[in-house]
């Protein structure tokens, strides 16, 4: 006889772990199934030759969600403030508070003196959105406050809720792609590039402009970002939840309420929470589909995954002082004022020749914006004495890398990318550091796809460029995002709501678990 659970959670990223934690908190018998041996998904820390590297997200923005969730579950571990710096060419500035926006404006004006007035108007837009953010994330998300103090409810939550309604309406109007939106204020494409090219393609204006608030909200867990899934898993196991890693789901039968694992085991569920790739989910459903299910399946299959990244992990024989003086612990670095709009992408990439692709890659890596992170500058134990681990990443096309693989030059592409990135960094910010690089590792969009099992290696769910979004994208409707057209099957994670990120993954994980709890109480 097959095993049976009140709820099965498929996917061991933070969304699935959150769902599982709250299911067990509410004493709902549950099993989490994860295809990889390791939990965490895009939140992971790995070690290589004594250096710790964060493989996915580099730091956490609380957004009124992460810390309240941990407090609600009684999970404690130390964090430090994560300071972000922004560098363009030879100039840089640290984001230390709201007044840092003044220095950011001055830096842009020094670089683009003819655009001083336009820059001032753009900064006014950023301040406006920061005002919205202060309201939207100004208090702990009430979803994670189980026992509400009546005084808190009356004096804090209700006034906040009234402001929230007003500000969410204002924010929801800023859905235009950020590049299009900024052209209202300037026609200088180079200026637009340095402001937005580290955002995902066609990121909505509100989401992009809000990042200046989110940067101030970043924290870093001592021990690396992987401490979060590690502590979540400990909580689940301590509360008698079951976790099965290294095992994937290959079939879902909604009619029989069963999942079939890749080892042939069939398990019965009352409720199912899918916290993994949605294309995989709709490809493995067995049985007949009604019109709503077929329509969603068709939409998912014709939609594109969001942007993915190219990452280089470096072990460098330079101490923390060298990197603290030049980049800090977390930096967004644009080496060139010639932005990505000047880089010509092969229109028909599936037909592009090797030489053309390498030329494109070199030019792209010279003009892109890099996110750089030094884990050991927040926690000295994360690198050998006198050394520093450096993570350097940039958005990069999945299609280009796939074409490189098809042409049989994938390994050459990785080596070329590392060589080019090292040269660009040496010339722009780290003089003399190449000879001190002990080792380098390169993770491409194909690596992301293989390791995370996310379609096209996407790191934030669906692309903003999709004509019709397969997920909910209205903040007011986020509670409905976890529902699917299939009876007693819910969803959570980065494919569930757009725009996504770690806080949204955690939030939807909690919402999905709440739906299961609600249905159980109604029986």
Where would I find each of the regions flagged by the language model?
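N-terminal glycine-rich phosphate/pyrophosphate-binding loop and immediately adjacent elements
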Residues: 3-138
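Active-site/ligand-binding neighborhood in enzyme catalytic cores
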Residues: 127-239, 246, 454-463, 468-469
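A glycine-rich dinucleotide-binding beta-alpha-beta segment and adjacent secondary-structure elements
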Residues: 188-201, 367-373, 431-498
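Active-site-proximal substrate-binding core of FAD-dependent oxidoreductases
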Residues: 517-523
């Amino acid at each position: 006889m097959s095993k049976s659970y009140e709820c099965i959670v498929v996917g061991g990223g933070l969304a699935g772990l959150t769902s599982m934690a709250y299911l067990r908190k509410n004493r709902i018998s549950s099993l989490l199934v994860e295809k990889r041996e390791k939990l965490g998904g895009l939140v992971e820390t790995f070690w290589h030759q004594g250096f710790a590297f964060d493989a996915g997200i580099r730091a956490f923005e609380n957004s009124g969600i992460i810390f309240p969730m941990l407090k609600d579950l009684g999970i404690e571990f130390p964090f430090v403030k994560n300071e972000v710096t922004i560098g363009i060419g030879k100039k840089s500035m640290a984001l230390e508070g709201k007044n840092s926006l003044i220095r950011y404006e001055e830096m842009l004006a020094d670089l683009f003196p003819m655009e001083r007035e336009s820059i001032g108007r753009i900064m006014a837009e950023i301040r406006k959105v920061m005002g919205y953010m202060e309201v939207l994330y100004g208090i702990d998300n009430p979803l994670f406050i189980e026992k509400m103090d009546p005084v808190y409810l009356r004096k804090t939550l209700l006034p906040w809720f009234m402001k929230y309604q007003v500000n969410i309406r204002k924010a929801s109007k800023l859905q235009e792609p950020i590049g299009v939106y900024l052209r209202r204020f300037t026609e200088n494409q180079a200026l637009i590039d340095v402001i937005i090219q580290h955002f995902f393609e066609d990121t909505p204006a509100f989401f992009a402009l809000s990042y200046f608030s989110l940067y101030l909200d970043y924290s870093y867990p001592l021990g690396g970002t992987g401490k979060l899934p590690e502590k979540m898993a400990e909580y689940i196991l301590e509360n008698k939840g079951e976790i099965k890693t290294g095992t994937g789901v290959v079939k879902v039968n909604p009619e029989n309420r069963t999942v079939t694992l890749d080892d042939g085991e069939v398990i019965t569920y009352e409720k199912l929470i899918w916290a993994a790739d949605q294309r995989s989910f709709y490809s493995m459903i067995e049985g007949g589909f009604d019109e709503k299910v077929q329509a969603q399946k068709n939409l998912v299959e014709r939609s594109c995954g969001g942007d993915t990244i190219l990452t280089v992990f470096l072990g460098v024989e330079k101490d923390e002082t060298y990197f603290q003086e030049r980049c800090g612990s977390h930096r967004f670095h644009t080496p060139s004022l010639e932005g990505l709009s000047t880089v010509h992408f092969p229109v028909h990439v599936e037909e592009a020749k090797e030489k053309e692709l390498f030329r494109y890659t070199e030019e792209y890596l010279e003009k892109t914006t890099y996110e750089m992170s030094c884990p050991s500058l927040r926690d000295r134990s994360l690198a050998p004495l006198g050394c520093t681990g450096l993570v350097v990443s940039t958005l990069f096309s999945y299609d280009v890398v796939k074409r490189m693989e098809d042409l049989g030059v994938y390994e050459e592409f990785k080596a070329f990318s590392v060589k080019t990135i090292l040269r660009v960094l040496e010339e722009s910010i780290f003089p003399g550091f190449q000879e001190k690089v002990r080792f380098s590792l390169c993770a491409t969009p194909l690596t992301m796809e293989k390791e995370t099992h996310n379609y096209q290696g996407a790191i934030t769910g669906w692309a903003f460029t999709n004509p019709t979004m397969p997920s909910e994208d209205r903040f007011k409707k986020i509670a409905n995002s976890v529902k699917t057209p299939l009876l007693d099957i819910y969803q959570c994670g980065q494919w569930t709501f757009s725009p996504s990120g770690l806080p949204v993954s955690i939030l939807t994980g909690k919402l999905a678990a709440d739906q299961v709890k609600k249905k159980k109480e109604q029986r």
